[in-house]
Amino acid sequence: MTCAHSTTGAPSKPTSAPCKLFRKALQSCYVRAMTQELTTSLPTEPVRPSESPGWWRDAVIYQVYVRSFADSDGDGIGDLRGVRERLPHLAGLGVDAVWLTPFYASPQADGGYDVADYRTVDPLFGTLGDADDLVRTAHELGLRVIVDVVPNHSSDQHPWFREALADRPGGAARTRYHFRRGRGVHGELPPNDWESVFGGPAWTRTTDPDGTPGEWYLHLFAPEQPDLNWDSSEVRAEFDSVLRFWLDLGVDGFRIDVAHGMVKAAGLPDIGRTEQAKLIGSQVLPFFDQDGVHEIHRSWRRLLDSYPGDRIGVAEAWAPTSERLALYVRPDELHQAFNFQFLKCPWDAAAMRQVIDESLAATGSVGAPTTWVLSNHDVVRHTTRYADGGPGRGLARARAAALLTLALPGSSYLYQGEELGLPEVTDLPDELRQDPAFFRTSADGQDGQDGQDGFRDGCRVPLPWTRSGDSYGFGPGGSWLPQPDAWSGLSVEAQTGDPGSTLELYRGALALRRELPGLGDGPMSWLQAPAGVLALSRPGLVCTLNTLAEEVELPVPGRALLSSAPLSYGAGTVRIPPDSCAWWAI
């Protein structure tokens, strides 16, 4: 089949005739009733997806940013019950697993990545029973569940940190974190020159019980996120226990937040320059990508392997080279590591090919799959990144990039809403923003061009499910961030059944990926192609990508299976539109 290019314009408003409103209400009630019937009839004993050793090597995994996915109770914030009710959408999309962002007890200083209790569900998102129900429902639908674990830092409201603040300098409670005396005559200066990823110093000074200034503590992110000290045996034992807690509940693995950051260089040496966030991912730093993290990951691999069902660990690791990143996925370490080199790659055929070659060579050298990703909750959505000043161009390129990544060997991660072609929301009012980096960078006057720029809220706007309603079906009430009016036409309801829509393009691609044995993990070779064009061969399939601003004419590679834009043919040739990708059966 061939999918036509979809448009981003919102359709005309549905009529307000009472019969149509009644019909929509009836459909909504029916969908909810069917979902409830499905999920309440599950067996009481845990069910796991069919055993498939190495399932993760070519899995397509969908990231759910929980607070923005679906709201079940009308408070404007997504929750676990909302995710559970929408799992049939993900099963129908054709993904293999779901990754959930943190839903643990948290003051929400950084969207839940500041954890106060790693074994408790925050009431904002539901209960432990809701988490258990979600895992059971996902497994019944054939979906695996990966949850976030945040080991680099805790919340400043974690009992351990409260104990540390109450303890004396050098006390046992403080050894779980990084407390240091300041520099200067009176300790008035930070212990070193490290900067927070969110802007400003990476150190905050404490106040002793008698009111005098005390030691400083390290936080590579917000002050509300003190870094844990992984030299502490207590810290290591605690996280082993946390992992076992969630594995016992039935989760299939963990996405490890800041997997490159738990170990700091001995002595906490100065870096010697400012704007350190710009160095992340370009060189080894005293606080990131230290070799000592690998021993921790090896111990976690042993723990994961002690459970049945191929449970996995996924590294969020910023490394300067593909070779450094591959160290995280050696056979005795983690299973996957996000390929941020590919995410950062410009829309250029030569640059893409270089990153693909380097990535496949590096992971292949350790026997691991490459893990491709285009967007996540920390970066500008790729529909907007690729736009280069033209929203239509951005969507065309995003659709093409999706087909390219799904044709490459290895695993692929999708960020919620990319299957709808959602763009970044760039006009959120400052008073509604919640990203802590926004407040830090604004206060410090930083330009935010690298690292986390303080505008991550724009990729976290709640999803549109229906054409109408206060929050386009996100929940019974409003949404914690406002959705653009144009998102009516980008909703799941608006795109379902439209053969030219981005949603149906993703559904078609994922269905073919399951059907074609040559896709996923396995060999790949490059075919000859003109400048600006990529042509790659997989067993039984050819993928062509045109990154140019004009169409190119090629010999017909095979039988057209799927394309991100309409194709046209000559005598034995095909004209590939600009910024488009196509799959061909051979």
Positions of the model-derived regions?
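C-terminal beta-strand-rich structural cap/linker in extracellular carbohydrate-active enzymes
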Residues: 571-586
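Acidic/aromatic-lined carbohydrate-recognition and catalytic surfaces
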Residues: 35-244, 248, 261-320, 463, ...
